[in-house]
Amino acid sequence: CYVIPGGIDVHTHFDLQAGAHRAVDDYYTGSIAAACGGTTTIVDHIAFGPKECSLHHQINEYHKLSEDKSVIDYSFHGVIQHVNPSILKEMEELFEDGITSMKIYMTYDDKLDDSGIYDVLKKAKELGMIIAVHAENDGVINNLREKYSKEGLLTPEYHGKSRSQECEAEAISRISYIADILEDAPLYIVHLSSETGLNEC
């Protein structure tokens, strides 16, 4: 007989609202499923909030969603949708409150540009915070998506083709170099789908 500690899942999406769709698991059902599989702690990726919202806004919203529901331990990755001095100050405040990681995006409407990425990584390094990143080249993806759409190529295989391994690898390379400029700011690449992308890590 062996006794091992409970698992920690650092990439969940409980109660996630994306447009008209909502994740099937909330903090009650998702945490029960996790516990049944031996996971005793999750760190949930919270969704984007309203445009220009504070970092605290989404953390507070997710505290409301999870309160008195989870049967296991949980925490959150914050989400950064834009960068300004107030956001950088909030990173400090949330870190002091126990939020030790933030997620940024290099694609989608709330992506950060390279200047914003630099500022966030710099602040995170100062704090000892980890930055999780969804790394894809947004501009190329949009061009490929438009190309396939015009050609009527809308089957699921073209979703993958519009997000080529090169789009992933380029973004991983770019953010890795920005982290190197900051003398190894800590990064967590949250989606890695190709050998080409892995080789850029």
For each of these PLM feature ranges, what is it?
Residues 4, 55-73, 77, 119-136:
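Alpha-helix-loop-beta-strand connector modules within alpha/beta enzyme cores
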Residues 6-12, 42-44, 74-78, 100-104, ...:
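Hydrophobic faces of well-ordered beta-strands that scaffold small-molecule active sites
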Residues 46-57, 61-68, 80-85, 91-93, ...:
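Active-site loop-to-helix "anion-binding N-cap" substructures in soluble metabolic enzymes
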Residues 2-69:
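Metal-associated gating/positioning segment near the N- to mid-region
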Residues 86-201:
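Histidine/acidic residue-rich metal-binding segments in metalloenzymes
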Residues 10-25, 49, 53, 72-86, ...:
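Active-site mouth loops of central-metabolism enzymes
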Residues 36, 68-71, 96, 181:
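Alpha-helix termination/capping residues and helix-transition junctions
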